């Protein structure tokens, strides 16, 4: 080991050689320099092609669109509120006028709906225009033979118009939709017969007839003609018992009980005449019966005491 020698070589230094000099030269030549570009917009002064928006706020377009939508929405709400208020006001006014007309019209409760009201109103207008009563029907519906629409003594009185004014125009002829006159201007294309119209007229005429009878009893009464009496007899319904029998039994009951309560003057006169006739015819019958059956025991004893031996008077 002692005889061997070690030879060491040093590595070449890069920085100290020619290679280091060449590297420094290339790095100095590859460096670059950067510059920033500055753009200046043209001024709007004296230039008509540039919009002058320096004094306007940002987002002006969005503000305009939002304001337009809000205005349309507010207009719709305002229109709905005004229309609702006007409709409610018109409805209240119409209801008030309808109530006033219903209170002023006395016969508005009879015909409230449907074609019956229009038919009745057209007939009333036509009768007022021509100043004549409608033609009386030959047949009446729902018991037309009760004599409500028949002629009475009221039609023959000379001052009937004055009584009609006092009554209030309650006299009305019955209307038959089948035979009575219907105005041509009323569009009626069916053969429908309304029973409610007949019933309402029947009730109204019964009330009016009751009022007219009161005035007829106070005023002049006249006898009906032969035709009227025959028609009344035909229209009169059949009776189960004769009314002439009832006053006789009623008078006999009070006469038997010796009571004058509830007996009219006519019944008193009839009962008085019957009592006279009965007394005049009953006395001979009693004498005849006594003769037939003989004298009574009390009468026979009286005759014996008086001296009559045969026991006869």
UniProtKB/Swiss-Prot annotation:
Region (Disordered): 22-48, 221-313
Taxonomic superkingdom: Eukaryota
Localization (cell): Vacuole membrane
Transmembrane segments: 59-79
Biased composition (Polar residues): 285-301
Keywords, in A-Z order: Membrane, Transmembrane, Transmembrane helix, Vacuole
Single GO cellular component term: vacuolar membrane
InterPro entries registered for this protein in UniProt: PRM
UniProt membrane topology term: Single-pass membrane protein
Bias type Basic residues, positions: 248-257
Biased composition (Low complexity): 22-37, 221-234
Basic and acidic residues bias (residue ranges): 235-247
Predominant localisation class: membrane
Family stated for the protein in its record: Belongs to the PRM5 family.
The name this protein goes by in its record: Vacuolar membrane protein ZYRO0A01628g
Species the sequence originates in: Zygosaccharomyces rouxii (strain ATCC 2623 / CBS 732 / NBRC 1130 / NCYC 568 / NRRL Y-229)
Lineage of producing organism: Eukaryota, Fungi, Dikarya, Ascomycota, Saccharomycotina
């Amino acid at each position: 080991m002692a005889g061997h020698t070690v030879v060491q070589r040093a590595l070449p230094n890069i920085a100290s050689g020619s290679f280091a000099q060449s590297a420094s030269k290339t790095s100095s030549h590859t460096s670059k320099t950067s510059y920033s570009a500055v753009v200046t917009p043209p001024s709007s002064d004296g230039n008509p092609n540039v919009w002058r928006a320096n004094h306007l706020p940002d987002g002006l377009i969005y503000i305009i669109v939002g304001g337009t939508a809000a205005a349309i929405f507010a207009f719709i709400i305002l229109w709905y509120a005004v229309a609702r208020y006007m409709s409610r006001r018109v409805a209240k006014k119409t209801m008030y006028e309808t109530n006033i007309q219903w209170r002023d019209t006395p016969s508005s409760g009879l015909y409230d709906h449907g074609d019956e009201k229009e038919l009745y109103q057209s007939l009333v207008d036509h009768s007022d225009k021509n100043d004549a009563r409608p033609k009386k029907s030959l047949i009446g519906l729902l018991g037309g033979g009760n004599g409500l629409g028949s002629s009475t003594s009221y039609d023959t009185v000379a001052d009937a118009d004055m009584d009609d004014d006092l009554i209030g125009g309650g006299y009305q002829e019955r209307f038959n939709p089948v035979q009575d006159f219907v105005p041509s201007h009323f569009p009626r294309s069916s053969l429908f017969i309304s029973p409610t119209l007949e019933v309402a007229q029947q009730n109204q005429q019964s009330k009016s007839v009751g009022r007219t009878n009161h005035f007829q009893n106070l005023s002049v009464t006249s006898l009906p003609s032969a035709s009227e009496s025959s028609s009344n007899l035909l229209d009169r319904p059949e009776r189960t018992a004769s009314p002439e029998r009832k006053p006789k039994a009623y008078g006999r009951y009070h006469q038997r009980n010796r009571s004058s309560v509830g007996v009219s003057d006519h019944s008193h006169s009839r009962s008085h005449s019957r009592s006279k006739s009965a007394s005049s015819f009953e006395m001979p019958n009693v004498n005849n019966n006594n003769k037939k059956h003989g004298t009574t025991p009390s009468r026979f004893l009286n005759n014996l005491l008086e001296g009559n031996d045969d026991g006869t008077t």
